Swiss-Prot record:
It comes from the Eukaryota. Stimulatory receptor expressed in activated or antigen-experienced T-cells that plays an important role in the immune response. Upon binding to its ligand ICOSL expressed on antigen presenting cells (APCs), delivers costimulatory signals that enhances all basic T-cell responses to a foreign antigen, namely proliferation, secretion of lymphokines including IL10, up-regulation of molecules that mediate cell-cell interaction, and effective help for antibody secretion by B-cells. Homodimer; disulfide-linked. Interacts with ICOSLG. Interacts with PIK3R1. Interacts with TBK1; this interaction is critical for the maturation of T follicular regulatory cells. Glycans are attached at N89, N110. This is Inducible T-cell costimulator. Induction: By phorbol myristate acetate (PMA) and ionomycin. Up-regulated early on T-cells and continues to be expressed into the later phases of T-cell activation. The chain crosses the membrane at residues 141-161. It is linked to Immunodeficiency, common variable, 1: A primary immunodeficiency characterized by antibody deficiency, hypogammaglobulinemia, recurrent bacterial infections and an inability to mount an antibody response to antigen. The defect results from a failure of B-cell differentiation and impaired secretion of immunoglobulins; the numbers of circulating B-cells is usually in the normal range, but can be low.
């Protein structure tokens, strides 16, 4: 009976770890779309005073931010690589712009806590999927079709105009009710047969 309770306890603990209820990794949304780009939100505990936060794309370091507290209440923030970041009381926001489908990857927030001790490293992350712009794809598909349809309509219009012009010209030439009637040429050199007949 005791072993059954022990297994049940381990099973519940495993479920809590997998769902992220213990470390809080599943309690917030990491990616927020912001002004045509993506804001990646990396959270840290409120009690942390000195830390290093790295934004990783796969295994590559994109951004590196270090917060240290010197003498007094001054705070110095070092950003080693070029990246736009924003620090708040319990999170660091990294901003990425001009992304396309090639930037889709796993992004991780690597937090190294220096103060308060003990030294601790946590890694949270998620997959950022970037869709190709739907308008761009639709234009790529419909632009050649639209151009081909325009050319076909122009050609058919020219053929129709030529046919109507020819039909109008040919019908006016043979119009029996027209102002001028075309007569057949008469050969005056022939003599009539009635002149030889006497009454």
């Amino acid at each position: 009976m005791k072993s059954g309770l022990w297994y049940f306890f381990l099973f519940c603990l495993r479920i809590k770890v997998l769902t992220g209820e213990i470390n809080g990794s599943a309690n917030y949304e990491m990616f927020i779309f912001h002004n045509g780009g993506v804001q990646i939100l990396c959270k840290y505990p409120d009690i942390v005073q000195q830390f290093k936060m790295q934004l990783l794309k796969g295994g590559q370091i994109l951004c590196d931010l270090t917060k240290t507290k010197g003498s007094g209440n001054t705070v110095s923030i070092k950003s080693l690589k070029f990246c736009h970041s924003q620090l708040s009381n319990n999170s660091v926001s990294f901003f990425l712009y001009n992304l396309d489908h090639s930037h889709a990857n796993y992004y991780f927030c690597n937090l190294s806590i220096f103060d308060p001790p003990p030294f601790k490293v946590t890694l949270t992350g998620g997959y950022l999927h970037i869709y190709e712009s739907q308008l761009c794809c639709q234009l790529k598909f419909w632009l050649p079709i639209g151009c081909a349809a325009f050319v076909v309509v122009c050609i058919l219009g020219c053929i129709l105009i030529c046919w109507l012009t020819k039909k109008k010209y040919s019908s006016s030439v043979h119009d029996p009710n027209g102002e001028y009637m075309f007569m057949r040429a008469v050969n005056t050199a022939k003599k009539s047969r009635l002149t030889d007949v006497t009454l």
